Regions:
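Short beta-strand segments
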Residues: 21-57, 88
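Charged, gly/pro-rich active-site loop segments
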Residues: 85-166
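Short, basic/aromatic recognition patches
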Residues: 2-23
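A generic local secondary-structure boundary/capping motif
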Residues: 14-15, 65, 129-134
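A short mixed-secondary-structure module that forms the rim of ligand-binding clefts
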Residues: 42-83
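Short secondary-structure capping/turn segments at boundaries of alpha-helices and beta-strands
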Residues: 12-14, 24-27, 39-41, 63, ...
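Short, surface-exposed loop/turn motifs at beta-strand boundaries within globular domains
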Residues: 19-21, 69, 137
Length: 166
């Protein structure tokens, strides 16, 4: 009998940076484990971290999206540039959909958060806007529920799994 899926229990610090909106890097490997990596142009995380949506420019993410379609695996890293606090999530069962007008508030909130966050390390709003530029008709949303989580903050705990909830 298959084990029921559990979800990682994310601590309050990791949840806070994820919900607020920090740098998000999305990756997926092909069947030969060759990775494809893209910067997200937005994210939305539920308060408890059980539902995550990351937004990508579809035209720039074709290989990554093919990899997700082929392997149904995804890894996403949330990293706070000013502190380097970083959490990596892994998941299967990824739902890919076109972004819609309903996603615009999440994309705008992400841009605002990243403008503040990157401003802390001297990156101005013009560069942030260019880095996260998108056309809504080119944006896809990848929705998932995390199955694994790892502390990737540089230091002695880097790479350690975050304990799972029962």
């Amino acid at each position: 009998m298959a084990q029921p899926r559990t979800r990682p229990q994310l601590n309050a610090d990791f949840l806070a940076i994820m919900v607020r909106g920090v740098s998000v890097i999305v990756s997926a490997s092909d069947p030969d484990l060759v990775p494809s990596v893209m910067r997200a142009v937005g994210s939305q995380v539920s308060a408890e971290g059980e539902h995550v949506t990351v937004y990508l420019n579809q035209s720039q993410s074709k290989q990554l999206l093919r990899n997700v379609a082929t392997t149904d695996r995804l890894a996403v890293v949330f990293s706070e540039p000013s502190t380097h606090r970083t959490v990596q999530l892994k998941a299967r069962g990824v739902r890919v959909r076109e972004a819609s007008e309903a996603d615009v508030p999440a994309l705008q909130a992400y841009l605002a958060s990243m403008t503040v966050e990157l401003g802390k390390i001297g990156i101005g709003p013009t560069l942030v806007a260019a880095m996260l530029a998108h056309r809504l008709d080119d944006v896809v949303a990848l929705e998932f529920s995390p199955e694994e989580a790892f502390d990737q903050t540089p230091g002695p705990r880097a790479g350690q799994p975050i304990a799972r909830a029962a």
